[in-house]
Amino acid sequence: MPDDGMKQAYRLARELLWDRLDDTSPGTTEILKQVHQADLIVVQGQYDHIESVLESAGMPYSVITTARLERAKLRPDQIVFINCPGLITSKTVRKLQQFVHQGGFLFTTDWALKHVLQPAFPGLVEYNQRPTADEVVRVEILDRQDGFLQSVLDAEDDPLWWLEASSYPIRILQPDKVKVLIRSKEIQERHGESPVFISFEYGQGVVYHMISHFYLQRAETRTLRQAAPSMSYVAAKGIGEQAQRKYQDLGAEEITTGQLESAFTSTVTLWGVVLRKKARDRDRKQE
């Protein structure tokens, strides 16, 4: 289970993201406010809980079981999130393949690499058969040119990512078709592959996959900066002194910069996927 510090970090990350967007990209907040419960479908899992990040971020969503997913009528304007382990039937695999081909977005984590992506989209990515230990690694965000990420992340951001024991490293089989959004040299050195977060186009839709679990249950500190109270991270994001009082009341002095930074990066990554989906649907309507 996540430690209390990470639960608090996710609550603070939501406030920080909205405050940062109000200053840098107010139009983005209006788009995000148009997300409806039926737009985001979370398939329950045993080991990951993406819905916890969605809830902390203030996103509306619907939760269904794998059995209900098999019967569900999916729309191409939706995003389907599949929590680890992603154990689904062959019928559901074909349903998801068709869903993405018609324009839907699919977001999976960890063991779903083997149980969902390999059978649904063969020949693109696979599990490299070298499971991880329970560890925290430094990650590098490669997609910083993305307009949304530019508006909320800074060059000083240096997030760490939690890997649960037996996470599945991602081997890319077709580098020309699979984009690495976040990578880790530490994972490559220890387990043979660097990708942390990837995406690829399929038909009119997009598939996203992340190693380990999206809801980070713990963090660690490696530098004095990361060990400092998270108020320093809040200030570095441009939050003024008067507005900082809100964060103090929310307990920002009780968690570290490392905890808030990891939760903020996780939250931002999720919002980025939702924004890309909204933008693509808007462009399709204008065609």
Regions found by a protein language model. Name each.
Residues 36-120:
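Helical hinge/lid and interdomain linker segments adjacent to catalytic or ligand-binding clefts
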Residues 175-194:
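Short, Gly/Ser/Thr-enriched beta-strand-loop segments that form substrate-interacting elements
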Residues 192-203:
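Short, surface-exposed beta-strand/loop micro-motifs that present aromatic residues
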Residues 107, 181, 208-210:
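Hydrophobic/aromatic beta-strand patches that form the interior of the parallel beta-sheet core
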Residues 1-38, 55, 205-206, 212-287:
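Extracellular ligand-binding/catalytic regions of CAZymes and related secreted enzymes
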Residues 47-48, 87, 113-114, 186-187, ...:
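Short, solvent-exposed loop/turn segments at secondary-structure junctions
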Residues 87-159:
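A glycine-rich, often tryptophan-bearing local segment used as a flexible ligand/cofactor-contacting loop or short
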Residues 158-166, 180:
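Conserved anion/nucleotide-ligand pocket segment
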